[in-house]
Amino acid sequence: MDSLQRLNGLLTLVLSALWHLGLTASNYNCDDPLASFFSPMTFSSSLDLTGSYSSAQLNWKMGTGGWSPVDSNAQQWLQIDLGNRVEITAVATQGRYGSSDWVTSYRLMFSDTGHNWQHYTQEDSIWTFVGNMNADSVVHHRLLHSMRARFVRFVPLEWNPNGKIGMRVEAYGCSYRSDVADFDGRSTLLYRFNQKTMSTLKDVISLKFKSMQGDGVLFHGEGQRGDHVTLELQKGRLALYLNLDDSKARLSSTVPLVIMGSLLDDQHWHSVLLERVGKQANFTVDMNTQHFQTKGETDALDIDYELSFGGIPVPSKPGTFVKKNFHGCMENLYYNGVNIIDLAKRRKHQIYSGNVTFSCSEPQIVPITFVNSRSSYLMLPGTPQIDGLSVSFQFRTWNEDGLLLSTELSEGSGTLLLILEGGTLRLLIKKVAGHGTEIKTGSGLNDGLWHSVSINARRNRVTLTLDNDAASPAPETSRKQIYSGKSYYFGGCPDNLTDSQCLNPIKAFQGCMRLIFIDNQPKDLISVQQGSLGNFSDLHIDLCSIKDRCLPNYCEHGGHCAQTWTTFYCNCSDTGYTGATCHDSIYEQSCEVYRHKGHTAGFFYVDSDGSGPLGPLQVYCNITEDKIWMTVQHNNTELTRVQGSSPEKPYSMTLNYGGSMEQLEALIDGSEYCEQELKYHCRRSRLLNTLDGTPFTWWIGRSNERHPYWEGSVPGVQQCGCGLEESCLDNAYFCNCDADMDEWSNNTGLFSLKDHLPVTHVIITDTNRSNSEAAWRIGPLRCNGDRHFWNAVSFSTEASYLHFPTFHAEFSADISFFFKTTALSGVFLENLGIKDFLRLEMSSPSEVTFTIDVGNGPVELLVQSPYPLNDNQWHYIRAERNVKETSLQVDNLPLSLREASEEAYFRLHLTSQLFVGGTSSRQKGFLGCMRSLHLNGQNTDLIERAKLMSGVTPGCPGHCSSYSSNCHNGGKCVEKQSGYSCDCTNSPNEGPFCQKEISALFDPGTSVTYMFQEPYLVIKNTSLLSSPIYTDTARSKETIMLNFLTAQAPTILLYLNFSSQKFLAILLSSNGSLQIRFRLSKGESHVYTMSTENLANGRVHQVKISKDGPEISIQMDQQLFSYNFSTKVEFWTLKSLVLGKVTETLGLDPEVAKVNILGFLGCLSSVQYNHIAPLKAALRHAGVAPVTVHGTLTESGCDSTLDSDVNAVTTVHSSLEPIGKRDEQEPLTNTVQSDSAVIGGIIAVVTFVTFCVIGIMICFLYQHKQSHRTNQTKEKEYPETLSNSFRNVIDLQNTASECKREYFI
């Protein structure tokens, strides 16, 4: 019922708005010529005219044939006085008859009084009209919004470069009737009701107003039960208070329900319309409408006794008001169809008025605008050498800094400066020598409001007054008399003056000033305009052209708008968006995109519609090798027990997923598959078994509908899954729980119909009987698959295209997609309007252009690529246009950007269909593939549209040609229908990109042995089964890789056992340097020592050994060593590969055997020999791989540092260090010779003491150990930190520790 009432209210408001629009449009006869019937004095101009005033009429051919000023410059204007306020709906222009003088563009201004002019605006910008191309043709413009004014000005902007300014003009419209009331700031109009209370379900209040002040109450009404409605000006903005039947919400304690408008104290007319139907309301200020819902408990507004306009009088206290009264004029004031001002004029008994008059008295205030921050200034003369000075004026600005006033004082008194610095007013009197005087006052004065300033100096004291609040007077420190100067410079300084005449330590002022007084005398600024008083540069006289660039607010997604005089900025902090207008999301649109950018599992924010209106939502992305699961948690994932519920008193739980339903729907709709698990445990608690078919328990999904199907069943069938399969505990029922047994049973299963997910409510009504109880759990929402990221099509002909509805993006437009092609050029997409258009194309094999026209001329952006874009690889394009800038991005190439004009924000008006892959002319179409097309964040389903069009095929194969490089460490790219995956079979790593290291902790007694007698069955690539490592033939190329971390030296890392007692061992010597010891042919063993750097330092190090024929290269971290065998050496058939301690010691090289006694204590990761990953086989495929594990092997990540206690224990120096014959070809540049005898002696002493301490510690620990430890392989563990885990491994060493103890003794 509430939704129906809300819909009713919205429909009524829409119809009401259309009715008001119809009233405006119904005046279709308002197009009569207005200027032709007036006397010649109707026309006037800025300065000289070549002929009489009457010659400016349209089609005038006599005399000079029109208006043409002597000087053609930007200060000229032609003005028409239409006698009274009229409604102007159109204008027309011609050039001067029989001449080469015409205007090619112009602006319109209008005024009620001939002063305080106002620009005609359209689309929130000062509108420029297209003028004439010759002297005789008439160019007619119908105004989008009519003007109501007495005076109209035509202001030429550009004219024929081969002639001068010349115009003949006409204005079209009709008479305008209005009822006006003038409020002096102390008066009100009261509309008394015939009954005590006026109760209304619908209200329409409309009026127009012009205000002299920034604050004041326009209307107010209230009731005894808390109802109230108030419209109030607050600092130049309209604040609306509206409350229905809520006694707690009093006007004095509430905040405005809606705030709209800005700069409404500009003494121009502004329109207001308030429409309410029940709790639904529309509030419109100057054609900008905001819809809102009122506060309160009922739909009726109950107002007692009266409505007041212009103020809130206090009952029984005449002349007393609750808030500041309105000072200004109101026009055409209507309350629910009643013309309030007309009743007051006719002195009807319902109206009680204070000091209200019925004509608008407007003071002749002339404002001026300082336009340029470098060259604007106003010079006004003063009376020099007066004892003291007095200057006052009002200003308004958006800039924090600017010069307000500079004047050179007489008699060596110095220079007086008044500047705005950081929004604070600062008065300085600077002396030629010595210190001056300084006064500061105010803050935030760049708020766009009018502020009054007064400076008074007498004798040696100076007073600065801001907004009638005087700052502390400052004495002039020199005690010297202050004398006034002869010239006062406002806003800036001319370029030709010295610093003593006009000093400006800051940039010129940009803003408005008015009511300038010097020596208590007002200055006539019209005389300044006419050249008879003072001097000026870059000023607009008789208008204040301040504009609120934050209204409307172009900062999207909650971005905060800040502005200066010329532009605005968006602060996007904490919004989740970035860019000039906070348009671009900083988050990706799905877990698939995070995977594509190299991320692994974790919590991420997902913004399903990108730059669209939906905000980001936190999800968990479980990115694995086969599927990518997106999980959204809710507020009740634990098992919940329920008792005492009945149909009369049901149990209900609402699930909160941390986001709106629209966000969740977008996530689900963008996924291929979604599910939620339900576990319902029951004891004498039924689900569906009722006599009338009404379920006892149900759940509610996304569309707010009840769903009584459970556990694997299907919609529309009121059963559980076991009922469909006929497998319930009691086949007489369709659910296990419906058997109503005293024992616990359950119905558990998955909901997977996307149109019904997510589960939002659970309702249970059958747990109020004896021993009746239920327990339920709804799992998180889980989805996989991305319907958008791999949504691709192929265009096969230049004439083929896809068409979509018109792209609506008036102020913000972003387009992104991937493409690949072999063609030389082609149009990606195009959308046309009457004048506007946008086009995105590959103009050459290395260039992409984005062309857009929003009505002010085409803008073309170009990105040139240093590599060809037609290489049949996927490339990414993103084009964006907003009111601040236009940009084009291709791949990761430099961004092409063009800033927009600050003077106008044009809407993009497109009318045709959007053509993708081609153009409306079916020429220059794109040949190739496109995918993942997004328009303003919304996905465009290319595949579905391609099914309806010829020449376009759904899908596009060949992803691995672009993305195979994403598969690392030997991983292989595998094509999929939608995208690709990485096969990590031949990689020592795992994960979606084969980047996740597989690593394990080793005890001194741990041994991992991989046997090579036969290939193991885990290998997925059958071609590897014939690898030479399984045969008796030798390989010419071999590769060994491993990462290690240890604090033990000496130690053994890896051992390769070949036939005929040949071997290769990777060791750390006693000083921690890396050694490669091998015997690959008959003869003695050889050893390569890579470096004397201590690698047993608790950090991860990487070793890679590559053999190619007689050459062998060894890379250790960032160092590379190269060697050549002196004789032919081959890697013969391997028998086994051992990590850690070698268990088969028969025939073991004596030197290796000595190190092998200690085993390996530390961490190994990413171990690989050719295509074999022995550590991965031991941890992932131990049941089928030919691998044997002895001792404790614990899976854990290798950390980069170890606990300090570990480092203190494990560096062991042994006198039994294996020594062998050094290869003669080992490079001397990468080795360090033996230490001196003195250093060796010191080390020996330190080593002996260390051995003793370690031996005592090990004996103490050994007494607390088990007497026997069986060989085992631990299952996968994830310790919180490696340091703690590693320390425990060392502290709890097994029997190998005993061996080490005996070895040291």
Curated annotation (Swiss-Prot):
Membrane topology: Single-pass type I membrane protein
Glycosylation sites: N282, N496, N571, N622, N1057
Signal peptide: 1-24
Keyword Protein biosynthesis tagged: no
The F5/8 type C domain, residue ranges: 25-174
SUPFAM superfamilies assigned: Concanavalin A-like lectins/glucanases, EGF/Laminin, Fibrinogen C-terminal domain-like, Galactose-binding domain-like
Pfam families according to UniProt: EGF, F5_F8_type_C, Laminin_G_2
InterPro entries: ConA-like_dom_sf, EGF-like_dom, FA58C, Fibrinogen-like_C, Fibrinogen_a/b/g_C_dom, Galactose-bd-like_sf, Laminin_G, Neurexin-related_CASP
Gene Ontology terms: cellular component: cell junction; membrane
Role according to the record: May play a role in the correct development and proper functioning of the peripheral and central nervous system and be involved in cell adhesion and intercellular communication.
Family recorded in the similarity comment: Belongs to the neurexin family.
Protein name: Contactin-associated protein like 5-1
Organism: Rattus norvegicus (Rat)
